[in-house]
């Protein structure tokens, strides 16, 4: 039976290194593996992002990495509610990509937890991982899914990634 392994963690936590080592070890043991990046599955959210720009809920800012759009979605609770629903729908659609893969282990680079953390930050939803949204999003995950969060010391993260 196919098993899904979701690897989560902040930028610089070592997800890629863990995923590569995990894939190598599972294949060494004779298991087939496939990798899929499951973050930013935007379909309807693309429309919401465009609308956010028109409504000035996303604004252009200049930082060390150049010109980027900064979300300030929290300024409109109604917009946030619709945005979270759209993200939920998009993740349900994206689930099909993972289900189509055929291997003993499907390694998912980020997914539900990472999406929820982003939504919590953009919409200022406190404790989103303990909310009704977590329960809804969690049901998107296929059966036989295990989630792992990579934890790394703050100094190590800051030292390895300039943007942190």
List PLM regions with ranges:
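Walker A (P-loop) ATP-phosphate-binding motif of ABC ATPase nucleotide-binding domains
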Residues: 4
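ATP-binding Walker
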Residues: 12-13
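Conserved phosphate-donor/acceptor-positioning beta-strand/loop module used by diverse small-molecule
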Residues: 104, 108-114, 130-131, 138-161
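Post-Walker A helix-loop "phosphate-sensing" segment adjacent to the P-loop in P-loop NTPases
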Residues: 24-35
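Walker A/P-loop
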Residues: 16
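Hydrophobic anchor at the beta1->P-loop junction of P-loop NTPases
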Residues: 7
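ATP-dependent small-molecule kinase phosphotransfer cores
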Residues: 40-128
